[in-house]
Amino acid sequence: MEDFVRQCFNPMIVELAEKAMKEYGEDPKIETNKFAAICTHLEVCFMYSDFHFIDERSESIIVESGDPNALLKHRFEIIEGRDRTMAWTVVNSICNTTGVEKPKFLPDLYDYKEDRFIEIGVTRREVHTYYLEKANKIKSEKTHIHIFSFTGEEMATKADYTLDEESRARIKTRLFTIRQEMASRGLWDSFVNPREAKRQLKKNLKSLEPCADLPTKVSHRTSPALKTLEPMWMDSNRTAALRASFLKCQKR
């Protein structure tokens, strides 16, 4: 699974997922299913925001090839993928600027057009089950919930899907591709079956035991994406990189 993740996801996404797991004391080399799930969730969050802007009249528009002269503002602020301190700084700044109620839990996005935080979910189970779990945890009508599944199903608060159909179809296609790629490598069953995943986790732990006392080289390189607090993730370079990653995965 680890090899699959590194092959089929953009390196920036992989780096952010590793950083998030290490922040909670988790090892991507051992908890590989969680590693894959975090990368998938990150990519969906990025794809959700791609190409969506607000013009000078505060109208929502979709722009795939950016006009440098256009007065555009990113419609979505991505909170997911930042370290917790920076993420809460962004949330507090948004709340102070817009007057929106501060959420109890870190959301994934903020929608400047609808003035609401968004919680994105990607599930391997039934969408309505996962939606209810999210709603019970958040316990706030102010945070909008949007759930996607690997089977093409989706569910959102009050059936308000926020994005146009084409943008949502792009996300569903990517999730279906990830599922097909996992299945072709014999990884899908363990990804969706907790019992099989637990067996694989034990196997991973056992394979690492002889190396437990070996020194580990740690990289202190910081992702360029984490060096700024201004709205990001939607630039053409990142979009091109994600597309390249998507096409690479498709051709396998």
Curated annotation (Swiss-Prot):
Regions that span the bilayer: none
Family that this chain belongs to: Belongs to the influenza viruses PA-X family.
Cystine pairings recorded for this chain: none
GO biological process, one term: viral translational frameshifting
Record-linked InterPro entries: PA/PA-X, PA/PA-X_sf
UniProt-annotated catalytic positions: E80, D108
Subcellular location: Host cytoplasm; Host nucleus
Site, as annotated: Important for efficient shutoff activity: K202, K203, K206
Tree of life domain: Viruses
Record keyword RNA-binding present: no
Positions marked as site (Important for efficient shutoff activity and nuclear localization): R195, K198, R199
Function as written in the Swiss-Prot or TrEMBL entry: Plays a major role in the shutoff of the host protein expression by cleaving mRNAs probably via an endonuclease activity. This host shutoff allows the virus to escape from the host antiviral response. Hijacks host RNA splicing machinery to selectively target host RNAs containing introns for destruction. This may explain the preferential degradation of RNAs that have undergone co- or post-transcriptional processing.
Gene3D superfamilies the UniProt entry points to: Influenza RNA-dependent RNA polymerase subunit PA, endonuclease domain (3.40.91.90)
Native organism: Influenza A virus (strain A/Goose/Guangxi/345/2005 H5N1 genotype G)
Domain commentary: The probable endonuclease active site in the N-terminus and the basic amino acid cluster in the C-terminus are important for the shutoff activity. The C-terminus acts as a nuclear localization signal. The C-terminus is recruited to host protein complexes involved in nuclear Pol II RNA processing.
Name this protein carries in UniProt: Protein PA-X
GO MF, one annotated term: RNA binding
